[in-house]
């Protein structure tokens, strides 16, 4: 009778998860965002996996024209539903959760998606947006499910599955290098706990080298097939350059030795300064500064820095797209290296502001009340965790709680 009841409840969870995501996939359709064309057009600045996914759907549904994007949205929604369901069912079985608690666990990713759709400025869900987040958020849930399984039981199959998903994530978004840091933390912790440090070091080396080598080869092979150049994607430095320019002052440009690079920096700086994009235009408190940085980050990078560098290089140099993008990267690197010594203290303030912001903000619109709410929640969370460990030891629930807190901290820091 209990098995039948559990089976019926499992079907209910499946229907809730799948029905939720597919409803919005059909109701909203495929959502095109600012970054979407760069993935659709397979631009060299993007990691390979998501453009490859779009290409696959474009080939399979070639007769549908732009309608293939709806197929992508449906696929991403099914992936999101399966990821949420997989994590819920794993935790229900492993932690012996009741039906009510299991339903709450399932609702967490669903309600987060609703916040993205109805409360966040973006006003759409990631699961049906043509963005890397469309698969990355779901893959991260699956990564967490298998890594937590490894942490609790030490199952090598779960670890290597998590490592493979980490490879997929890094090949989708460079920011997902956080999964490697979580993977390393888990292996080190299990090795110390089981007193198998040498074996753990070997496993750690295999996982990290496998992920790094695999992502490098996929990146280079993809660019060779698409552009005829066995090289990695370009423009990674633009993210650092954006923050460097945000924290800079005009006189910092004097440190740039090459005249053309210095003039290029000054032209970019003037546009950003006039638009109020830079750090000195922000408020005094960390909350105001982090809000200002978030509001104007894209204005610096997408609207100003990136177009200025691309236009300058294409006007003054000749060559194929891959070679021109390498020149763009060289200009980026020159600005970063020259300005970094002067802007570094300000850069650290930006970093600290955004770590604090990341610890308290949500996908909802910013409001100061979240700061105090988050302080109370973190304190309560840590107190409850310590109390639980004292009473029950480092059991499955404690491991899940520690993993969640560590994932948040690494995510906001990276």
Enumerate the language-model features and the residues they cover.
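Transmembrane-embedded, aromatic-rich helix segments that form part
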Residues: 161, 174-190
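Transmembrane-helix motifs of polytopic, lipid-linked glycan transferases
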Residues: 74-99, 138, 142, 146, ...
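Membrane-interface transmembrane helices that cradle and orient dolichyl/undecaprenyl
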Residues: 141-158
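Membrane-proximal stem/loop segments at transmembrane-domain junctions that anchor or position
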Residues: 231-352
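Extracytoplasmic catalytic/substrate-binding loops of multi-pass membrane glycan-assembly enzymes
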Residues: 24-67, 328, 348
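Membrane-interface alpha helices of multi-pass inner-membrane proteins
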Residues: 159-173, 208-214, 219
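Membrane-interface anchor segments at the N-terminal boundary of transmembrane helices
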Residues: 70-79, 318-408
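Transmembrane signal-anchor helices characteristic of membrane glycosylation enzymes that use polyprenol
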Residues: 5-33, 110-114, 209-222
């Amino acid at each position: 009778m209990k098995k039948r009841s559990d089976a019926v409840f499992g079907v209910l969870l499946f229907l809730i998860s799948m029905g939720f995501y597919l409803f919005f996939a059909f109701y909203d359709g495929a959502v095109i965002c600012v970054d979407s064309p760069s993935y659709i057009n397979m631009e060299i600045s993007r990691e390979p996996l998501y453009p490859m996914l779009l290409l696959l759907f474009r080939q399979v549904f070639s007769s549908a024209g732009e309608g293939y994007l709806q197929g992508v949205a449906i696929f991403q929604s099914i992936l999101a539903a399966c990821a949420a369901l997989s994590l819920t069912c794993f935790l229900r079985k492993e932690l012996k959760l009741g039906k009510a608690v299991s339903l709450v666990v399932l609702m967490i990713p669903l309600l987060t998606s609703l916040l993205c759709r109805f409360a966040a400025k973006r006003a759409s869900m990631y699961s049906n947006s043509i963005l890397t987040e469309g698969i990355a958020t779901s893959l991260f849930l699956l990564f967490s499910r298998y890594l937590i399984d490894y942490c609790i039981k030490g199952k090598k199959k779960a670890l290597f599955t998590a490592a493979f998903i980490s490879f997929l994530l890094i090949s989708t978004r460079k920011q997902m290098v956080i999964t490697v840091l979580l993977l390393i933390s888990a292996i080190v912790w299990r090795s110390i706990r089981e007193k198998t440090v040498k074996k753990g070091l070997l496993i750690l080396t295999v996982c990290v080298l496998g992920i790094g080598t695999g992502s490098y080869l996929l990146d280079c092979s993809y660019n060779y097939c698409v552009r005829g150049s066995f090289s990695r994607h370009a423009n990674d430095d633009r993210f650092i350059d954006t923050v460097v320019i945000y924290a800079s002052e005009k006189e910092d440009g004097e440190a740039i030795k090459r005249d053309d690079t210095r003039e290029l920096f000054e032209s970019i700086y003037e546009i950003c300064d006039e638009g109020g994009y830079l750090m000195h235009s922000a408020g005094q408190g960390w909350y105001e500064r982090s809000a200002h940085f978030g509001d104007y980050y894209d204005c610096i990078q997408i609207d100003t820095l990136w177009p200025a560098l691309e236009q300058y290089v294409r006007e003054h140099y000749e060559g194929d797209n891959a070679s021109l993008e390498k020149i763009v990267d060289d200009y980026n690197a020159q600005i970063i290296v020259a300005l970094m010594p002067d802007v570094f203290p300000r850069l650290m303030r930006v970093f600290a502001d955004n770590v604090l912001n990341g610890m308290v903000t949500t996908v909802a619109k910013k409001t100061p009340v979240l700061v105090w709410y988050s302080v109370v929640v973190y304190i309560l969370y840590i107190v409850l965790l310590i109390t639980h460990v004292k009473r029950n030891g480092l059991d499955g629930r404690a491991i899940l709680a520690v993993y969640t807190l560590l994932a948040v901290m690494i995510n906001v820091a990276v």
